[in-house]
From Swiss-Prot:
It holds the Pfam family RNA_pol_Rpb1_1. Keywords: Cytoplasm, DNA-binding, DNA-directed RNA polymerase, Magnesium, Metal-binding, Nucleotidyltransferase, Transcription, Transferase, Zinc. One of its GO terms (biological process) is DNA-templated transcription. This is DNA-directed RNA polymerase subunit Rpo1N.
Length: 880
């Protein structure tokens, strides 16, 4: 068979003759099976249409199930019907051409000129040719008299979905499909071309169906239900309805039935043919099963997420994959994933037998499919597969294998697999991990790996895929391993890093009050692979003590320099340089942590230009992996030793603090009352550009916002600096000072759409308030804290504010998902060429220099090509 190169794909409309030629049989009866359950010849399951049962031979091509592609049949329609997919095209043809002579309603000399222009531009500038066609249609539709035959033209209206009405001498006449077909037949080929169609492959009258193609059985196979009853495909049901109606229409015409009955049956045939193509036509009731379920017809098989394109071509279900719940395991390396034994025994990797690995593989074969590490299949050099479940003497088989065999063995420690969590919103939602087979029934994941996957452990499930070829495994190992993706391609900062307990532990270990004995240091270092001298303790007498900073310094490169504020550098503890009494400015000189604490700004995930970021960027991702596998584990160990809990005592403030807050609330309420009094007396000064009512709302909101801030400051002033809740908030481990304010002092103003709550009953939010009351409490201000508890109406307002967040989340998720899909489809053919330009599939330049600087964000210094300050700091240990 000679090879051919595909130059292009051309779409057209099937002519009635083409439908008959590609058909192997006419479908003439609505009966499907006879009494024995054998398909009837001339029915919709005629054996000539293809084979769906194994062992049968196709009477047309002689092939079995594996080789028979299926064959088309056809139904000769008694009356023509409109193809629902071409209604708009038919409408354009009818309005642009004369009903009598079929010519475009434009003068002959103008038509000749348009033809010359169209022929000159149609190949070189197809978009310009399309605009010319639209222009021809536009001016032709406007003409009320045919310039060729002089006939008066009537206005045609489309009554959706497929009825065409014509206004003739004041009355409205419905055009039948036969009449429409006659008109379309009269349009000459030259005019069809000027209206944008190729008359060789798309004559307009072919859009009115006289012959309906019947698809092969292979695309609409029947299934046998457990009870032994055959269930037919939705398309088969629809085709039976069409044939049944076609027969009734034929009988009615032959019996000389009244025109009204014939037209009703014709309309019904039109409905069935339309819903056969698309069962979701606006304005048309969908065809349904007896159960009430709408039929899934041709368009539904192609459209949407579950359709043929997105469901079976762009995305497929795959083998060698697993899915289960994820659990945290801080003892795994960031590059590893814990896999249950059950899954490790089911998923296999093909390993080729060589003289080096033959003994190990023989042991896998002896272990078999049920004992880990074993094997499930042996593939001989001739391609035959041996299933080890059915081999009685596995030892004999193991001894017979030689180099060249392939064994599908179980997953073992160190195998490379792909790990993914949906929704996969960016590239690093799928990364490669190394297998660690563990007991249990869940996947185990290091907590540091959560941010790129956006994973947590409240029931999330993740997918695992096992690459099968050496090339795929090599690509995954070189490009996709977790430590090679610590720096995100989004902005060039570390997406993997500390969070929650890691940050609390790092802060408590690095804070200047932390002193450790040699034994405690040894306990902490026991979870790391540190080997080396501890150095001299910071305190020698009365007892040797190391500081937490000394322990952390053991893991920093000896030439590493860094300066920068910590997360706790806020308010009264803020520091701008190294002269800092609050320990809130980090100074690392020649690998020694001299000052400052490690918190979110130093080691947190998604923190660009942090200590973690520069150390990974300058010493490589292997160092970053080592740091996370050791130092971060050490932070957790220290937290375990010290203990870290949260109790009600942590959010209880003394009475004097509560009295201060109550006084401030009263002052705030008085201020609001004063604004309301001024408003009622007409003395309130409006804010420029706002109405007096808007100004009042703005003044009240500002006052209540200040009140919440003051209450929060009072509450935190009375909290112990080593209060665990306070530590979590100031270090950036979890929560914020606002959360502390809400737990200890007051919740503050609840808002809906950025305003105070105003909807409810007429002129008041709830029935317990007076009409027209706009005081803080009547409009959603909550003066209680979570600790003290909310009153019933405060609880109601709080729920109203919370609901807005839930609705927002649901709406934005679907909107952003759809926007991303459109963006991906629009940008999918862009790529960076070797000359640095960004080009489309056709070579069009979209960007002369990628990103205007030709720098990959992943390898940039936080989106800059070079950070000069950092270069100076790195070399001389000081910033400019």
């Amino acid at each position: 068979m000679s090879e051919k190169i595909i130059r292009g794909v051309k779409f057209g409309v099937l002519s009635p003759n083409e439908i008959r030629q590609m058909s192997v049989t006419a479908i003439i009866t609505s009966e499907v099976y006879d009494e024995d359950g054998t398909p009837i010849e001339g029915g919709v399951m005629d054996p000539k249409l293809g084979v769906i049962e194994p062992g049968q031979k196709c009477p047309v091509c002689g092939n079995t199930l594996a080789g028979c592609p299926g064959h088309f049949g056809h139904i000769e329609l008694i009356k023509p019907v409109i193809h629902i997919g071409y209604v708009k095209h038919i409408y354009d043809f009818l309005r642009s051409t004369c009903w009598r002579c079929g010519r475009i309603k434009i003068k002959e000399q103008d038509l000749e000129r348009y033809k010359r222009i169209y022929n000159a531009i149609k190949l070189r500038w197809p978009s310009a040719a399309r605009r010319l066609v639209e222009y021809i249609k536009k001016i032709s539709i406007k003409n009320l008299e045919c310039p060729h035959c002089g006939e008066k033209q009537f206005k045609i209206k489309l009554e959706k979905p497929y009825n065409f009405n014509e206004e003739r001498n004041g009355s409205i006449v419905k055009l039948s499909p036969s009449e429409i077909r006659d008109r379309l037949e009269r349009i000459p080929d030259s005019d069809v071309e000027l209206l944008g169609y190729d008359p060789k492959s798309s004559r307009p009258e072919w859009m009115i169906l006289t012959v309906l193609p019947v698809p092969p059985i292979t695309i609409r196979p029947s299934i046998t239900i457990e009870s032994g009853i055959r269930a037919e495909d939705d398309l088969t049901h629809k085709l039976v309805d069409i044939i049944r109606l076609n027969e009734r229409l034929k009988e009615s015409i032959e019996a000389g039935a009244p025109q009204l009955i014939i037209e009703d049956l014709w309309d019904l045939l039109q409905y069935h043919v339309a819903t056969y193509f698309d069962n979701e036509i606006p304005g048309l009731p969908p065809a349904k099963h007896r159960s009430g379920r709408p039929l899934r017809t041709l368009a539904q098989r192609l459209k949407g997420k579950e359709g043929r394109f997105r469901g079976n071509l762009s995305g497929k279900r795959v083998d060698f994959s697993a899915r289960t719940v994820i659990s945290p395991d801080p003892n795994l390396s960031i590059d590893e994933v814990g896999i249950p034994y059950t899954i490790a025994r089911m998923l296999t990797v093909p390993e080729r037998v060589t003289n080096i690995n033959i003994e190990r593989i023989r042991q896998y074969i002896i272990n078999g499919p049920d004992k880990w590490p074993g094997a499930n299949y042996v593939i001989k050099p001739d391609g035959r597969r041996i299933d080890l479940r059915y081999v009685k003497d596995r030892k004999e088989l193991a001894s017979s294998i030689t180099a060249g065999y392939v064994v599908e063995r179980h997953l073992v420690d160190g195998d490379v697999v792909l790990f993914n969590r949906q929704p996969s919103l960016h590239r690093i939602s799928m990364m490669a991990h190394k297998v660690r087979v563990l007991p249990g029934r869940t996947f185990r994941l290091n907590l540091l790996d959560c941010p790129p996957y956006n994973a947590d452990f409240d029931g999330d499930e993740m997918n695992l895929h096992v690459p099968q070829s050496e090339e795929a495994i090599a690509e995954a190992r070189e490009l996709m391993l977790v430590h090679k993706n610590i720096i995100t391609p989004r902005y060039g900062g570390p997406i993997i890093g500390g969070g929650q307990d890691y940050i609390s532990g790092a802060y408590l270990l690095s804070v200047k009050t932390t002193l450790l004995t040699v034994e405690e240091v040894a306990t902490i270092l026991g979870v790391t692979d540190f080997v080396g001298e501890l150095g001299e303790p910071a305190i020698l007498a009365p007892k040797p003590y190391y500081t937490g900073k000394q322990v952390i310094s053991l893991f920093l490169p000896k030439d590493f320099n860094f300066h920068g504020p910590a997360n706790i550098s806020k308010g009264p503890r803020a520091c701008k340089d190294e002269i800092c009494p609050h320990d809130s400015f980090i100074v690392i000189k020649n690998g020694l942590l001299l000052e400052g604490v490690f918190d979110k700004k130093a080691i947190g995930n998604q923190q660009p230009e942090s200590m973690l970021h520069w150390s990974i960027r300058e010493y490589g991702t292997e160092y970053g992996k080592w740091l996370m596998d050791n130092v971060f584990k050490m932070f957790i160990r220290f937290l375990e030793m010290r203990g870290f809990t949260m109790t009600l005592e942590d959010i209880t403030i003394p009475d004097e603090a509560q009295n201060e807050i109550t006084t401030k609330i009263k002052e705030g309420y008085s201020q609001v009352d004063e604004y309301i009094r001024k408003f009622n007396e007409g003395q309130l000064e409006p804010i420029p550009g706002r109405t007096i009512e808007e100004s009042l709302e703005s003044y009240i909101l500002d006052t209540l916002d200040k009140l919440r801030k003051v209450a929060g400051e009072i509450a935190t002033k009375y909290l112990d600096p080593f209060n665990n809740v306070y530590i979590m908030a100031i270090t950036g481990a979890r929560g914020s000072e606002l959360n502390i304010t809400q737990m200890t002092a007051l919740l503050g103003q609840q808002s809906v759409r950025g305003e105070r709550i105003r909807r409810g009953y007429r002129e008041r939010t709830l029935s317990l308030f007076k009409y027209g009351d706009i005081a803080p409490e009547a409009r959603g201000f909550v003066k209680n804290s979570f600790m003290r508890g909310l009153s019933p109406y405060e609880m109601f307002f709080h729920a109203a504010g919370g609901r807005e967040g839930l609705v927002d989340t649901a709406v934005k998720t679907s909107q952003s998902g759809y926007m991303q899909r459109r963006l991906i489809n629009a940008l999918s053919d862009l790529r960076i060429e070797y000359d640095g330009t960004v080009r489309s599939l056709y070579g069009d330049i979209v960007q002369v220099v990628y990103g205007d600087d030709a720098v990959h964000p992943m390898y940039s210094a936080h989106s800059k090509s070079v950070n000069v300050n950092r270069v100076i700091e790195r070399v001389i240990g000081w910033k400019r």
